[in-house]
Amino acid sequence: MCVSVGESVAQSLQQWDRKLWDVAMLHACNAVDETGRKRYPTLGVGTRFRTALRDSLDIYGVMATPGVDLEKTRFPVGVRSDLLPDKRPDIADVLYGIHRWLHGHADESSVEFEVSPYVNASAALRIANDGKIQLPKSAILGLLAVAVFAPENKGEVIPPDYQLSWYDHVFFISVWWGWQDHFREIVNVDRASLVALDFGDLWNGWTPVG
């Protein structure tokens, strides 16, 4: 039986409050997966997850990694990508890999990760020496925002006290389901101010997967 987007979002925020980051990440990924299934019912799970996330990279980014140009950033990690011609993974590939890994799949579409706390009040987004991707805990909130504000999720149900926030703005989820365009108007991201991450020498040992 499929868990609803509302249930996944609620479970993720419950685990967030308990600082159980991996479990919170699992439920947040599930919320995006179910959102992708609604939007692209004929696509396979990997394609629909990545595509739904790429549709809302700006929303994910403003919540998870403010200031980073995620459309241009590529990650030298060992995970399959569907991006041509060079198959360098983007954040959607990485997050789908995490989704696979959290569900117990050890294959070329999965990637190990760890959630790191904020460092000097800024979000960390790094590749560790062992090849794990290090994500800020705000990555969980980015995934939740993608699901919460997706138009397909209008009508989802969650208790009235659950919320997301962005600076001084508080979004009570029960009344914000599906308001993607309005959220974009509020955050009003200036793309010219975003900077792509450069992983430099880490690309030297990287080869495409699959």
UniProtKB/Swiss-Prot annotation:
Superkingdom as given in the UniProt entry: Bacteria
Question: GO CC terms for this protein?
Answer: peptidoglycan-based cell wall
- Please identify the protein, giving its name as recorded: Uncharacterized protein Rv1289
